[in-house]
Amino acid sequence: MICCVEVRLTIPDNEARTALSTLRRLGVSVERLERADLYRFDVEKDAEKDLVATLRGFETVYNPNKHALRVREEERPGAGEVWVDEIDGAEVRSGGAVRIGGRALPGVRSMERFTAWKLMCATGAAVPERVVLEATETLLCNPAFQKATRK
Protein backbone atom coordinates (compact mmCIF):
# COMPACT_ATOMS: atom_id res chain seq x y z
CA MET A 1 0.00 0.00 0.00
CA ILE A 2 1.29 3.46 -0.88
CA CYS A 3 1.06 6.16 1.79
CA CYS A 4 2.05 9.78 1.06
CA VAL A 5 2.79 12.00 4.04
CA GLU A 6 3.24 15.76 3.69
CA VAL A 7 5.13 17.83 6.27
CA ARG A 8 4.61 21.57 5.81
CA LEU A 9 5.89 24.54 7.80
CA THR A 10 3.31 26.50 9.76
CA ILE A 11 5.78 29.34 10.29
CA PRO A 12 6.94 31.62 7.45
CA ASP A 13 8.92 29.64 4.86
CA ASN A 14 11.89 31.75 3.76
CA GLU A 15 12.90 29.24 1.08
CA ALA A 16 9.47 29.41 -0.56
CA ARG A 17 9.42 33.22 -0.28
CA THR A 18 12.83 33.47 -1.96
CA ALA A 19 11.81 31.05 -4.71
CA LEU A 20 8.57 32.99 -5.33
CA SER A 21 10.44 36.28 -5.56
CA THR A 22 12.95 34.76 -7.98
CA LEU A 23 10.25 33.18 -10.16
CA ARG A 24 8.46 36.53 -10.41
CA ARG A 25 11.70 38.32 -11.37
CA LEU A 26 12.22 35.67 -14.06
CA GLY A 27 8.77 36.44 -15.46
CA VAL A 28 6.92 33.32 -14.28
CA SER A 29 3.26 34.15 -13.65
CA VAL A 30 2.74 32.86 -10.11
CA GLU A 31 1.29 34.71 -7.11
CA ARG A 32 1.69 32.15 -4.31
CA LEU A 33 4.16 29.33 -3.78
CA GLU A 34 4.11 26.71 -1.03
CA ARG A 35 6.76 24.12 -0.23
CA ALA A 36 6.54 20.89 1.75
CA ASP A 37 8.57 17.79 2.44
CA LEU A 38 6.75 14.83 1.00
CA TYR A 39 7.42 11.20 1.84
CA ARG A 40 5.97 8.38 -0.28
CA PHE A 41 6.05 5.07 1.58
CA ASP A 42 5.27 1.55 0.46
CA VAL A 43 3.85 0.13 3.69
CA GLU A 44 2.55 -3.23 4.74
CA LYS A 45 -1.21 -3.55 5.07
CA ASP A 46 -2.56 -1.90 8.25
CA ALA A 47 0.79 -0.16 8.97
CA GLU A 48 -0.28 3.35 7.86
CA LYS A 49 -1.77 4.39 11.20
CA ASP A 50 1.34 3.30 13.10
CA LEU A 51 3.56 5.00 10.52
CA VAL A 52 1.93 8.40 11.06
CA ALA A 53 2.26 8.06 14.84
CA THR A 54 5.91 7.05 14.44
CA LEU A 55 6.65 10.04 12.18
CA ARG A 56 5.05 12.42 14.68
CA GLY A 57 7.65 11.19 17.18
CA PHE A 58 10.65 11.83 14.89
CA GLU A 59 11.88 15.33 15.67
CA THR A 60 14.06 15.32 12.53
CA VAL A 61 10.88 14.98 10.42
CA TYR A 62 8.14 16.66 12.44
CA ASN A 63 8.19 19.36 15.12
CA PRO A 64 4.66 20.20 16.32
CA ASN A 65 5.75 23.76 17.10
CA LYS A 66 6.47 24.54 13.46
CA HIS A 67 5.06 21.77 11.23
CA ALA A 68 1.73 20.43 10.05
CA LEU A 69 1.64 16.75 9.06
CA ARG A 70 -1.05 15.17 6.92
CA VAL A 71 -1.62 12.01 4.94
CA ARG A 72 -2.38 12.85 1.33
CA GLU A 73 -5.06 11.05 -0.64
CA GLU A 74 -3.08 11.33 -3.87
CA GLU A 75 0.02 9.30 -4.69
CA ARG A 76 1.09 11.77 -7.39
CA PRO A 77 1.27 15.56 -7.72
CA GLY A 78 -2.02 17.39 -8.02
CA ALA A 79 -2.95 20.38 -10.15
CA GLY A 80 -0.39 23.17 -9.86
CA GLU A 81 2.15 20.89 -8.17
CA VAL A 82 5.58 19.53 -8.96
CA TRP A 83 7.52 17.06 -6.82
CA VAL A 84 11.30 17.32 -7.04
CA ASP A 85 13.76 14.68 -5.88
CA GLU A 86 17.38 13.75 -6.49
CA ILE A 87 18.15 11.48 -9.43
CA ASP A 88 20.38 9.19 -7.36
CA GLY A 89 19.32 7.76 -4.04
CA ALA A 90 15.85 9.22 -3.69
CA GLU A 91 14.24 5.86 -3.08
CA VAL A 92 15.26 3.75 -0.10
CA ARG A 93 14.58 0.03 -0.31
CA SER A 94 15.89 -2.28 2.30
CA GLY A 95 15.97 -5.96 3.15
CA GLY A 96 15.75 -4.79 6.75
CA ALA A 97 13.90 -1.85 8.22
CA VAL A 98 13.77 1.45 6.34
CA ARG A 99 15.24 4.20 8.52
CA ILE A 100 14.99 7.96 8.87
CA GLY A 101 17.68 9.62 10.95
CA GLY A 102 18.84 6.20 12.13
CA ARG A 103 15.40 5.26 13.45
CA ALA A 104 13.46 2.31 12.04
CA LEU A 105 10.07 2.61 10.37
CA PRO A 106 8.22 -0.64 11.15
CA GLY A 107 6.09 -2.00 8.32
CA VAL A 108 7.73 0.20 5.66
CA ARG A 109 9.11 -1.61 2.59
CA SER A 110 10.42 1.48 0.78
CA MET A 111 10.47 5.26 1.01
CA GLU A 112 10.93 8.16 -1.41
CA ARG A 113 11.46 11.76 -0.30
CA PHE A 114 10.45 14.77 -2.41
CA THR A 115 10.20 18.53 -2.14
CA ALA A 116 6.63 19.34 -3.14
CA TRP A 117 6.02 22.77 -4.66
CA LYS A 118 2.48 24.08 -5.11
CA LEU A 119 2.04 27.06 -7.43
CA MET A 120 -1.09 29.20 -7.18
CA CYS A 121 -2.66 32.28 -8.71
CA ALA A 122 -3.96 35.19 -6.62
CA THR A 123 -7.26 33.43 -5.86
CA GLY A 124 -5.48 30.37 -4.45
CA ALA A 125 -6.39 28.19 -7.43
CA ALA A 126 -3.70 26.08 -9.08
CA VAL A 127 -1.82 27.72 -11.93
CA PRO A 128 -2.06 26.16 -15.41
CA GLU A 129 0.26 23.24 -16.20
CA ARG A 130 2.32 25.38 -18.60
CA VAL A 131 3.22 27.69 -15.66
CA VAL A 132 4.23 24.70 -13.52
CA LEU A 133 6.46 23.50 -16.37
CA GLU A 134 8.01 26.96 -16.80
CA ALA A 135 8.73 27.30 -13.05
CA THR A 136 10.15 23.79 -12.91
CA GLU A 137 12.49 24.32 -15.85
CA THR A 138 13.45 27.86 -14.78
CA LEU A 139 14.18 27.37 -11.08
CA LEU A 140 12.55 24.59 -9.07
CA CYS A 141 14.42 21.63 -10.57
CA ASN A 142 18.07 21.39 -11.60
CA PRO A 143 18.18 18.59 -14.21
CA ALA A 144 21.88 18.00 -13.54
CA PHE A 145 21.01 16.16 -10.32
CA GLN A 146 17.24 16.37 -9.81
CA LYS A 147 14.11 15.06 -11.50
CA ALA A 148 10.63 16.51 -11.48
CA THR A 149 7.31 14.68 -11.28
CA ARG A 150 4.30 16.63 -12.48
CA LYS A 151 0.62 15.79 -12.85
Task: Briefly describe each language-model feature range.
Residues M1-K151:
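Core nucleic-acid recognition elements
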